[in-house]
């Protein structure tokens, strides 16, 4: 009952719930982002680029480990809530609005970008992979910090998984287009309350934060 799977998008949930009668709990790595205030503090203390959510180091790994562990141990009739992150406000959603799950849970789906990724050899960090790294991380502080997180705390989190499913994008070039489509849908669903919706330029910059880890994923996670 405690098998964890990652990389499966939410489109699989109705099939599992209705067709197989499986009790499924879904948690995205996005839902354990540090709060906006915590990321701003990290950006001031370590490197300004850490204000932008997404890369290893911008998640509350302890929260993720606790949630997955509690889901595995959830007994019959017991309930717990799952954290949720509001991308339209770039902050963790109010705890009172977190969804509730009732035990026992048969399957935990832990999905999202960078799940299952591994740290790079130190020598691979020397050369910037894009303009963002060249201009805003010229001394490599940010990318070394991110890499260190992957090799330590994130490795412990990913070790909790029993299986890994990777959905292969056709190329890195497809990712900005998909991200922009998500922003359009997010703006439509959030309405006037959306304060952090990205335009084309914003998406282009945002994706550069992810490039260093995404390209090895596409090459090696198959």
Where do the protein language model's features map onto the residues?
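Post-Walker A helix-loop "phosphate-sensing" segment adjacent to the P-loop in P-loop NTPases
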Residues: 14-25
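Single conserved hydrophobic/aromatic residue that forms the stacking wall/gate
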Residues: 2-11
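Conserved nucleotide-sensing/catalytic segment adjacent to the nucleotide-binding pocket
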Residues: 25-28, 32-90
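Glycine-rich phosphate/ribose-binding loops and adjacent secondary-structure elements
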Residues: 91-102
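Conserved NTP phosphate-binding and transfer environment spanning the P-loop NTPase/kinase superfamily
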Residues: 114-222
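Loop/turn-to-beta-strand initiation segments
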Residues: 77-78, 104-108, 163
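Structural alpha-helical scaffold elements that stabilize or flank donor/cofactor-binding regions
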Residues: 11, 101-102, 157
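Switch II (G3) loop of P-loop NTPases
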Residues: 108-114
């Amino acid at each position: 009952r405690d098998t964890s799977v990652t990389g499966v998008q939410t489109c699989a949930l109705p099939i599992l719930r209705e067709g197989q009668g499986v009790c499924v709990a879904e948690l995205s790595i996005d839902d354990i982002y540090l709060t906006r205030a915590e990321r701003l503090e990290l950006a001031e203390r370590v490197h300004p680029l850490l204000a932008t959510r997404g890369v290893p180091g911008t998640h509350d790994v302890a929260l993720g480990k606790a949630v997955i562990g509690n889901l595995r141990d959830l007994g019959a009739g017991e309930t717990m809530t799952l954290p949720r992150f509001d991308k339209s406000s770039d902050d963790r959603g109010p705890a009172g609005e977190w969804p509730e799950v009732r035990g026992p849970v048969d399957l935990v789906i832990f999905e999202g970008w960078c799940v299952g990724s591994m740290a790079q050899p130190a020598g691979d960090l020397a050369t910037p992979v894009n303009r963002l790294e060249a201009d805003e991380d010229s001394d490599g502080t940010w990318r070394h910090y991110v890499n260190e997180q992957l090799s330590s705390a994130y490795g412990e989190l990913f070790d909790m998984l029993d299986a890994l499913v990777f959905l292969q994008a056709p190329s890195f070039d497809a990712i900005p287009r998909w991200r922009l489509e998500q922003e359009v849908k997010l703006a439509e669903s959030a309405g006037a309350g959306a304060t952090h919706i990205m335009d084309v330029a914003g998406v282009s910059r945002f994706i550069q934060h992810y490039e260093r880890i995404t390209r090895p994923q596409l090459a090696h996670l198959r």
